[in-house]
Structure formats: C-alpha cells, structure tokens
Amino acid sequence: MRYLGNKTNLLNFIQQVIKKHDIQGQTFADLFAGTGSVGDYFKGEYTVLSNDYMYFSKVISEAKLLNSEKPKFDSFVKRYGKTPFQWLNEREYTPNDGYFVYNNYTPRAERMYLTEENALKIDGMRLDIEELFQEGVISKAEYSYLLASLLESVTKVSNTSGTYQAFFKFWESRALKKFTIMPLEMKDSLSVSKDNRCFNKNTNRLVREISGDIAYIDPPYTITQYTNSYHVLETIARYDNPELFGKTGRRVKREFSGYSNKSKAYYEFEDLFRQINFTHVLVSYSNQSIVPLDELVDLARRFAVDGIVEVETNEYREYSTNNSSMKGEGKKLQEVIIYFKKNLETNKSPLNYAGSKDDVIPRIFKLLPKHVTTFVDAMGGAFNVGANRTALNKVVYNEYHPFVFEMMQMIVNTPADELIRNVEQIVTRYSLEKKGKEAFNRLRDHYNNEEQTPINLYTLNIYSFQNILRFNQAKKYNTPIGNNEFNEGYKDRITRFVTRAPEVEMRLGSYSAINFNEYDDDTVFYFDPPYLVTTAGYNDGKRGFDGWDAEQEASLLKYLTELDSAGKKFMLSNVLEHKGKTNHLLMEWIQHHGFNVNTIGETGIKYPRREILVTNYNTFER
C-alpha cells in the first residue's frame, strides 16, 4: 500500500537500535501503526499492542497480528470448495442504492476515485465479507484478513497519486484495470501471542490505559491529515454510510490529529511523553517535521531517566505529497529514532504526613491537561504530588503549616547524603530506637525548649506514633513515641526524592494568598484539603493550628470559583461520601458549576475512603 510514512524500509533500522541499546522486554506497542508493518515485523518476538486512530489501519493490523500466516479458511473451503478469494472474484453484483462506494466515489457522484465497474465489485465484496463473518463462516482473524486484503486491493485500482485527498480528472491506466481481491502480504511467524491486541483510539488517550516494555512511536511528521488522505479506505472499512462533503467526498465527522497541527504538535508530544507507561520509548521522527528535532529531544530529556536521550540517524527518502508546506525543499530527509528510558518512578516523600497522595499519584496525573507550564501544589504537605510532576517551567510548593514547610524546605534543599548524616547524628546522640520512650522524650524536650530546628522535628517525626505531627496550643510538639525507626527504607526515600520540574519555588502561607493571576493559563493548581467527612490525623486537635471545618471548606470553594472564572485550571482532591456522611457543600458546588468528577479510587488504610478528583477542564476535546 502506498502510505504516508510507511516504515517498511526502516524495519532493520528499528531492529538495530533495539539491539544497540540492549532493549529487553516482552511487550511491544506500535502506537501509530499505519499499515501495521512494524507490528508485523516484531510479532514473532513480542506480544504486540497495535494502535491507530484510523479504523482501516486497525483492520490491517488485526489481519497481521491475529494470524501467524495467511489464513487457510478451512470452514469456508469446506462449505464452498474454493478459497474466499476465488469465490469473491467470481461473484456478480447488481447496483443498488445501498452500495455506498458505487454511489459516492465514482462518476455517478461526479467523483473519479474508482470506475463504476470496480466500485460495484468493492461494495459487493465488502458486504459479502461482513455476511460471512456474521454467519460464522469465517473467524474474526479471517474476517480481518479478508477485509484488509480488500482494502489493499482497492489501492491498486484507485485513480489517485497515492492518497485520497484528490482524484485525477482523467483515468490513469491502473484505475482502468478490472478489480480483483488479492491476499494481503504479511510476514509469517512460528506463532503469534494470544495477547496481541489492536486498538482504534487516540494514542494520547490509550497510553493512559496500557503499559508495557517497549513503545514505538511513529506520529505524523507533517500537516497532512491522515483522516483526509485515506477517507475512502476508512469509509470502505467502516461501511457506515457517512455524510460526505465537497468535491472530494470527505467524511463530515472525522478526527483530526493534533500531531499534524503546528500549534498543537508540541503539546501532543508533551502529553504523550508524560503519560506513556512503558520502560523503553523509541520515537521515529525527521529533520523535516513540524516540531524541530532539537526541541523534541529536549522535551524527551525532561521525562527520561537521568535526562539521557539517544538520537540514532538514518538516511531516508522523502515521500511525495500534495502538501508543499512541509517538504524539504531539496534537503535530504534524515530519519532518526529518539530513544530514552522513561522515568516511571513515583518517588515517595521522605516526610510521612497525614493525607499524602503517594498511592494515587499515577491516577491523578492521568487527568492532567496536555500542556503544563507550572504546577502549583497549593496545599503541599509532604510534596508527594508536586515533586513528582514534570511541569515544563517550574513547580510551586505552598504550605500553610510553618513546621511542615520548614521540614520540606530542608528536604528539598539539602543534599541527600548530608540529610541522612544529620539524622544519623541525632539518632546516635540520643540513642533513639523503636519504642524508646525515654530517649525520644529527651529529644522532644530539647526540641520544644532549646532547639526548634527542622532537622530535630524531622527526626522526631520519624520515631513518633503513626508519624502524626501534633502540637499543643503553645506550639509545643506533643506526639508520643511510636513503633518506627530511621532505617534503610527512609534512607532510600531521601536518596530517591528528587523534584522533576526544572525549577522549584517554595512558598509559606495559605493557598488564599496565592495570586493566581500571576500565572499563565497553562498553569495547573492542585488542592488537597483535609476532608470534611473523614477522620484524619491533621484534624485531630487542630495540630495546634487552624483546623478544617465547613467555613474553611466554603472559603476554598469560593477561591476555586474565582480561579475558574479567571480562566485558570484546577484539580481538587476530595471525598463526597464516607461512612454515611455526605459533603453537601462540595456536591452542590460541583453540580452548580458543572465541573468534572473523576473517581480516583480507595485510599487510606485505617480509614478507607473513595477519593475523587474535581477538575474544571477537559484534557481531550469533546
């Protein structure tokens, strides 16, 4: 098939990159599959997940990934005594109003994609294939193979230059050939994984749902929209009688790719790199693409382990297209593969603090918008959410509790080995140990009466009961000893805790002191208040500071309403119902403003609760 960006000639190059970097794994995702050549090539080595937002592409991938070799159609041959290709080619068809191709893509509709004779055969065969499948004469794998063979055969008699953006105004010799359905060419393998799956989704949506070892990304490089280039094949595959428009008969309802849009492509990549849940990422791109290559590599570094990105080059030819705006103007096309290991770790904060979100962070992040310049963690706490978020410019940590703020400021700004050494010195000096009440109380007295430093409080918090941070009205720390100690787990968390954004801003104060108008519209403000309808350590005794009640809740909702009116984006973690209690304030506010409610899941061990995330934006257009 003549297909824009077909990677058949680059299969060895992809294999070489995998071998060079010793990329290991069992699952291979081909996320922009096109004609399925990459998945077909690797199906003997991996479980393959294939995806394309064009349905006809899914059909072709199914034909190749559900079959280890060309199907033998045993049931069909047993019934008809011949192959379905022989049977279909021998069939005679009579025009009728239901034959969509015949009535819309031929001179009958003043279009010259196909001759009337060939269109008649294509319609008849398409409907016969459907009927054979519905009657159980052919299996799903056989159905996909037959339909893919039909689509491939259509391209052999199409009166076009290779795509369906336009048709010739004269009949090219190939278009006058009599239509014959021929078996689709595919690679034979000893077997194919029963777990191979083919999707027909927007890739950026899909990566929020799947995971694996190796992801191969081959997005559109130019402004050419595939939905316009292959609309005839799409309609034959779907056979859904769509509404058409214009001289070329394109589908009215169709999805455009953001990767082919100059103003959106960079943000599509940002979102894809942020959300992809695969260990190894390979991206095919070129020096003639919408997003400049150096910008794409720099973007990949932000999401790569240790910021390491490899760029492998390969000379390649330019494919001819009717769009001149993205052609190389005589420059030799250089195809590259960008390779990096995705940083998939969620680094848990070294500070144990009530309400921390480390167990639901991945689910929260799936709901982020595609473009995030700044991430404001407005009620930062242990900084689990903000520190793990890759915003392109910076992350802002804001916390109203001065002692929590001072500890997190110390953790963020102190080298890991120094912080570990400082804690160990205090542990040794006071002979701290599990349930060591006397030693713990000595350190607590020293902190309350002599040296109220962040490092002393942090060490106390490690050994305290359930790591509760509690103070009396005199601001004296009064949590008792617990069954905890400074162990290798803590040291590992300190070592691994690194903020992802290029810059971190630390702010002490209430969320209400944040002037959201100082931030651009691609800033995301995240709020994680205490929950009215649950029991939490930070509501117990008010921690010696302001507590959280209905008045506080109403103030927060008012602030969020103002933020929304200013055109800013927010995420709000909360709980609507728990143990028979309902947060009516929150529920009415959400319904009144029409905000989105996303279920995050169960959190909490002692007091399990079903958490939600409220957002005032849509990640994907509706």
UniProtKB/Swiss-Prot annotation:
Enzyme nomenclature, EC number: 2.1.1.72
Catalytic function, reaction form: a 2'-deoxyadenosine in DNA + S-adenosyl-L-methionine = an N(6)-methyl-2'-deoxyadenosine in DNA + S-adenosyl-L-homocysteine + H(+)
Organism superkingdom: Bacteria
Keyword check for Repeat: yes
Stated name of the protein: Modification methylase LlaI
Function field: An alpha subtype methylase that modifies unknown specific adenine residues, and protects the DNA from cleavage by the LlaI endonuclease.
Keyword DNA-binding among record annotations: yes
PANTHER family (UniProt xref): DNA ADENINE METHYLASE
